[in-house]
Amino acid sequence: PGVTKVTIDWGEMTADERSAVMTRARWNAKEQASDTQVPLNARVLAIASGKGGVGKSSVTVNLAAAIAEQGNIVGVLDADIWGFSIPRMLNMPDRLEAQRVEGSDKPRIIPNERKVGSGLLKVVSTGMLVEDEGTALMWRGLMLTKAVEQFLNDVQWGELDYLLIDMPPGTGDVQMGLARMLPRTDLVIVTTPAVSAQKVAIRAADMARRSFLRVAGVIENMSTFTCEHGSMYELFGNGGGQALATQIGSPLLGNIPIEAAVAHGSDTGEPIVLSKVGAAAEAFAAIAQRIISETVSMQDMVGCSARNEKVVQVSVSQRR
């Protein structure tokens, strides 16, 4: 006789169970990813946004400078292949060069370097490959992914404490390629107070979730403007950053106010955070310190990683 009755018991996973599944997925992605030239001990942060014009590149260079100033070696990868701006924002226009290095069977791209405080910035960008910054790169999607892959695999990064990646806006080829090639990346999502920007930025968070990437937090840029008389204005609305952070379950890392000095610093290649003058500089420094503190805490937990992996495996197997 055939089957006469089938009973299916089902239920919704708890938050802890969903977290365990996501953790396991991240472990699997890391185990299956190919090796890159990015040191395993370096914390990787991709500065992302759902749309352009929210100040993502400005956030990248200021956080990189603030973290380096504390004595860290910070890599900056300009993955905004079409819209590169990092060389100007850091006043590093020199062309990249390739050299033979010991232990490699092919030449490696050598990052351009800049001392910051007691630390060091190591920077690569397609803007350091073209004749001048006005040259358009008319590349299709596959070429964009290959460029990022080359920056990860063929750059002699050497010693790094952090790698900050300035992502292009949106959720396209570069984002998907990075998730595949460097799955240990944490995302920092930049938005503005405007509800419209927040609704677009949620797509970056959704991409991270579907790619099993962790969102380290949200930064609200262009938060408020204070005039010379001390009155504060919310030119782009309010609450977008906190609303996004709450919606995706990640912390709001900080709010960056609108100051002309931020734009001036980007134009002249001197990140405002290094001036230590103004509320924007203080906000960038505070966010950088928060990232450093979290990284130290994460490193303290490395010794427990094997035990945590076993716990995750047991939890996932019990759901099967």
Can you describe what each PLM-predicted range is?
Residues 1-49, 95, 288, 295, ...:
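Extreme N-terminal, non-catalytic leader segments
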Residues 67-133, 138, 145, 152:
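Phosphate-binding loop that captures ATP/GTP phosphates
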Residues 43-81, 201, 205:
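Walker A/P-loop phosphate-binding motif and the immediately C-terminal alpha-helix
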Residues 154-157, 161-268:
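Conserved catalytic-core segment of NTP-binding enzymes
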Residues 41, 52, 78, 86, ...:
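Residue-level signature of catalytic and energy-coupling elements of molecular machines
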